[in-house]
């Protein structure tokens, strides 16, 4: 494992950039569909204390401010599903908000929930490739190598991975082809669990 960390994994930067662009396009299309269907979500109730002609406020007349839909906001997703899809949450967080995760969105199974699920999935994948703290493109060296840490020094003697966690690479072939054998070498795999 020490040699693996020192040698690093060969990382196909060009394919990673192409995949990032593809994911960003998919995200834009999905966000566009959701925003065209549900443009805004309900914001806070506001009661002006005085008239404001430029803003159109009238003293004492309450109104609800609208916010543009953020398809990756769990609060916005819950509001859309409850308001437009008549969804009744079964699980709540400690603060009383509905739990909105991948499992819940799959269980709902509506077209809208699956679009929100796609947005969350793409966001997670973009975090792995380019946006996260331990994003692969950020940790790739000038030699196109990623030197991650893999250890069996856990209580259960299972592998622990970090900086980045390459054990969590999605099984999608588009992601697996980013990690290749060094040119002129052969990649041999083993299951360490």
Model-derived features: where do they sit?
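Conserved "right-hand" nucleotidyltransferase catalytic core of DNA-directed polymerases
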Residues: 1-175, 180-186, 192-193
């Amino acid at each position: 494992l020490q040699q693996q960390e020192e040698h690093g994994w060969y990382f196909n930067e060009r394919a990673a950039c192409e995949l990032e662009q593809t994911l960003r396009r998919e995200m834009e299309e999905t966000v566009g569909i959701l925003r065209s269907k549900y443009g805004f979500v309900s914001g806070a109730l506001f009661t002006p204390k005085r008239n404001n002609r430029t803003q159109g406020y009238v003293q004492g007349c309450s109104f609800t401010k609208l916010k543009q839909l953020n398809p990756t906001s769990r609060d916005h997703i819950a509001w859309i599903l409850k308001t437009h899809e008549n969804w009744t949450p079964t699980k709540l967080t400690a603060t009383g908000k509905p739990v909105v995760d991948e499992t819940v969105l799959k269980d709902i199974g509506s077209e809208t929930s699956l679009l929100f699920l796609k947005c969350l999935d793409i966001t997670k994948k973009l975090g792995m490739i380019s946006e996260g703290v331990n994003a692969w493109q950020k940790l790739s060296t000038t030699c196109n190598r990623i030197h991650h840490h893999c250890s069996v020094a856990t209580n259960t003697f299972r592998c622990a991975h970090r900086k980045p966690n390459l054990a969590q690479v999605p099984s999608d072939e588009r992601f697996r082809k980013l990690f290749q054998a060094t040119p002129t070498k052969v990649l041999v795999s083993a299951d360490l669990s």
